[in-house]
């Protein structure tokens, strides 16, 4: 399900812009995905030049990239808080900052890091902008619960699909050992209400709706970048 649209130049501009807001001494949440990767690489170069930061990765992939870039890391339980988290999104309503995440199956840890952060700065290219969220909502589910969860969301008007792995037989398994169920609700008119509804389903570890977490977003375009705050 992971979206790979958008130009590399646009993604790079967004990632670099967010990384440039990081100050010396900050604890920084490091998100997952192709656009956030540019932010991590930019921070790595800044660390080489003397910037003093600590990174808190949201996934195995983010951790490995940060290590490769020379960024000192700690786990979420090893810090008192996070000053700023930088992460991507699969869809974003620009007017409100409501977004959909989970194409990389890391949304459970991403939401944990976002909840611990004083600020969440999203980085996206302009292909991720939409007036209304309408992509399937990723649910991280306990392996034994996926059938029950699927039946429940069908009763709520969703069409669930267990996400299949691309390079192995069987389903995608998250870093935390959960499965991912992508649920198509069509156009989502009330994301906050849907988020509450999904959170109440037994067996759902986390959903990919981020309703009121975002404080800023940098939007990369082929010819520039713009930043909005919320």
Regions found by a protein language model. Name each.
Residues 1-91:
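N-terminal active-site beta-alpha-beta segment that forms phosphate/nucleotide-binding
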């Amino acid at each position: 399900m992971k979206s790979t649209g958008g130009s590399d130049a646009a993604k790079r501009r967004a990632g670099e812009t967010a990384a440039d807001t990081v100050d010396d001494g900050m604890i920084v949440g490091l998100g997952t995905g192709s656009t956030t990767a540019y932010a991590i690489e930019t921070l790595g170069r800044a660390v080489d030049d003397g910037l003093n930061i600590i990174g808190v990765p949201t996934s195995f992939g983010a951790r490995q990239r940060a290590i490769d870039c020379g960024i000192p890391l700690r786990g979420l339980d090893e810090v008192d808080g996070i000053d700023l988290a930088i992460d991507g999104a699969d869809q974003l309503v620009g007017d409100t900052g409501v977004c959909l995440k989970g194409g990389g199956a890391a949304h459970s840890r991403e939401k944990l890091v976002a909840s611990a952060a004083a600020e969440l700065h999203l980085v996206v290219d302009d292909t991720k902008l939409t007036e209304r969220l309408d992509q399937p909502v990723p649910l991280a589910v306990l392996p034994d619960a996926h059938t029950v969860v699927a039946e429940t969301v069908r009763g709520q008007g969703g069409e669930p699909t267990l996400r299949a792995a691309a390079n192995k037989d069987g389903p995608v398994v998250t870093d935390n050992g959960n499965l991912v169920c992508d649920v198509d609700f069509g156009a989502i008119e009330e994301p906050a209400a849907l988020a509450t509804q999904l959170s109440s389903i037994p067996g759902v570890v986390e959903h990919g709706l981020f309703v009121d977490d975002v404080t800023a977003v940098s939007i990369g375009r082929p010819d520039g970048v713009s930043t909005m705050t919320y």
